Amino acid sequence: MEYQKLNNNAYNIHFIKTTKFKKIRIKINFKEKVEREKIVYRNMLSLILLESCRKYKTKRLLDIECEELYNASIGSNTTITGNYQLLSFNSVFLNEKYTEVGMNEKTFQFFLNLIFDPLIIDNGFEETSFNNAKNYLLEDIESYEDSPMRLATSNLYHEMFEGTPIEYRVCGYKEDLEKITKENLYEYYKELIKNNHIDIFVVGEFDSNEMKKIIENNFKINTIKKPATSHIINHKTFRKVTNIVKSPKNINQSILLFGFKLNNITEFERLYTLAVYNSILGGSPDSKLFREVREKNSLCYSISSTYSGINSYEIISAGINKNDYNKAVKLIKKEIKKMTLGDFTDEEIKQAQITYIASLKEIEDAPSSMISIYEAHEYLGYDLMADREKNIVKVTRADIIALSKKLKLDTIYLLEGVKENDKGN
């Protein structure tokens, strides 16, 4: 695998060359600082731009053209990564090496048509596509109430990170969606195209000079952007007393969450030590939390831990019976304390490192995952795969103990089920 980055001031090109795949994957990211009210705008564009364009005015015509391009596929999504939000468009198509000369450029041109030449009527997006996208997004926003885990996590974020990008729901908010019109969405679209930072990632087997020429001949963006600031969110305030919150909900099972802020961690801790710590605590099937809380004491239906180096937090989540709340909290705190005291084995450290390396190996089998590695390198300064393999095995017991002391318990949140009986597990 060979990586090359090209910068022409208006956008960056990232070539990830490999002979493992017959298809080429192209991903285009539009990036800007997170603004809460703009989240729904970006979600709307994610939906509407792949529904039609000036050349292909219906979804049916788009589908026919995809078939003509040897079943090329297109997709889009939005994400929030720390201080920034990304609007991403993807295209996957068969390499012209296996079809006919010129198909790489032809498919790329089709892809760009969707992004840069939308179907605009009277200074606004076409009404049917606009309404379809708005209704779909409204359903997604309203579905938060139907997903206990999503709702509980969102409520925890509100308690811990109010007023910061971490708090914001990636789907956006109903009150912001209600303000969107066909016209103001188009105005925002034009601002996005002009002002967003843009990165183009290409994965597959191709000639770099030829692909560079294809991109530069067709990608007509020339606005020079100011350098972006850091994605990473570091916390400056920490609670002296843990915040305890309970919210009733008409569900059968209660959701228990522990939220920790990370205090002044190093880059090595962010990328490596935290991964090992989390795996041992609750991030693997044989973790301490699973063994002690779930298997030995039967105090939960499920339990795990996750972390975000970008957002500098660690979260423990468990599905419990509300009657076991006090016992579960006590036992979870006990396992956290064990990590601080170094009460874990060398074998647990080694297994966490092996699991980490195995996950890196799997990345090489998926073009989308390969892109994620280089996105993290570009946006966060994270190491590439070869360096990650070398560095993960450098994590020591002392490193894990030192990191554990930087986890500051901020909030214990319970989404309390009111349908539950008192039988326990």
Show which residues each predicted segment covers.
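M16 family metallopeptidases and their MPP-like homologs
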Residues: H14-I16, K22-V34, V40-R42, R60-N113, ...
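Short, polar/flexible loop-turn hinges at active-site or ligand-entry regions and domain interfaces
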Residues: S52-K55, E96-E100, D117-E126
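Short, low-order "capping/linker" segments at domain edges
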Residues: E139-S143, K240-Q253, I357-P367
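Glycine-rich, mobile lid/loop segments that gate access to catalytic sites or pores
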Residues: S143-E145, M160
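Active-site glycine-rich loop that binds ribose-phosphate moieties when present
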Residues: K179-Y186
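Low-complexity, intrinsically disordered Gly/Pro/Thr-rich segments
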Residues: T396-S404
